[in-house]
């Protein structure tokens, strides 16, 4: 059963855009920081650092820089998922609002708190002289819950896209980096924090 009209229209997908903007800013910062992470080692000349440790140090520096760039890309994907999802949810909500208004203009009034999308005919809101039509009532009774379902599906699709992006972020940390620096823990915590924020968006329509 789809969420009611009142539930759907209480959602505020614009909040996802605000979150996405913050993630895009984080991506930009990571893009800038990525070369700085490895360059202090990679920029040393062979004369400045020789010995058996140089090769592994270079490899690790390259790994850190490459990982940061990959993380930046994944955060970009996460932000894009949130932005696209917000647009899709907003579009679905607008479609439901417009269909409800159109039905009302013909005299078919939606019970906006009903998850069954009950429609009743009110001659006072219908065009002058209009009478109840079983065909029109059926059309609105069928279309409106379909729009409610589409709105719910837009939220589900957005949730799945965001969870997929979060999973990618959590899965790309090299073991050497995670073990030595605790970066994996921080990345996982960031992912969980974002998921909690998004969860509140779903539950509270915030």
Q: PLM features: what roles do these ranges have?
A:
Residues 1-178, 182-193, 202:
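N-terminal secretion-targeting helices of virulence/extracellular proteins
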Residues 197-206:
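Membrane-active amphipathic alpha-helices enriched in small hydrophobic residues
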